[in-house]
């Protein structure tokens, strides 16, 4: 009876998919975007340049479709790091980084454009790229899935 019941337990991959994910940021160069997977979903981690940060902070967020200031999308004192879902909020495609008119992401499926803060600026997507829970563990490591 026990072998049958134990087969109902989730496999190691399923269990691991729900656990927090540690990411070492040290090798990520300024201006580089990396993709990781957490809970089976792609996540963008963007090491933003000073130009990208300034552009995101000075944009008129109140006039955007899904208004949100850059300060609500990054951690205080760590504005160079943006961590968002890599899934377009229109129909679920994966946008391409550093493309489009806003130095952010461009979704080739239907033309949605996001800025360097992951906010929707143009196209059919209704919402900003979703934020994911994460916290810093020191200066060069984040833990996705914890706050």
Region locations from a protein language model:
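Rieske [2Fe-2S] iron-sulfur-binding domain
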Residues: 54-147
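Short, surface-exposed binding/anchoring microloops in extracellular/periplasmic proteins
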Residues: 37-52
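C-terminal segment of N-terminal export signals and the immediately downstream linker at the start
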Residues: 1-41
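A sequence-level detector of short, solvent-exposed, charge-rich linear segments
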Residues: 20-24, 47, 107, 137
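Alpha-helix initiation/capping motif
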Residues: 24, 49-50, 71-72
């Amino acid at each position: 009876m026990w072998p049958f019941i134990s087969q109902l337990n989730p496999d190691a991959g399923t269990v691991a998919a729900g656990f927090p994910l540690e990411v070492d940021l040290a090798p990520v160069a300024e201006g580089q975007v990396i993709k990781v997977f957490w809970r089976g979903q792609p996540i963008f981690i963007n090491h933003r340049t000073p130009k990208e940060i300034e552009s995101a902070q000075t944009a008129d967020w109140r006039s955007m479709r899904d208004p949100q200031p850059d300060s609500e999308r990054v951690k205080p004192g760590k504005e160079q790091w943006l961590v968002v879902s890599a899934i377009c909020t229109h129909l679920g495609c994966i946008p391409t980084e550093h493309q489009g008119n806003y130095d952010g992401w461009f979704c080739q499926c239907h033309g949605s454009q996001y800025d360097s803060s992951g906010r929707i600026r143009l196209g059919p997507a209704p919402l900003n790229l979703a934020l994911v829970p994460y916290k810093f563990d020191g200066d060069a490591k984040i833990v996705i899935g914890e706050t």
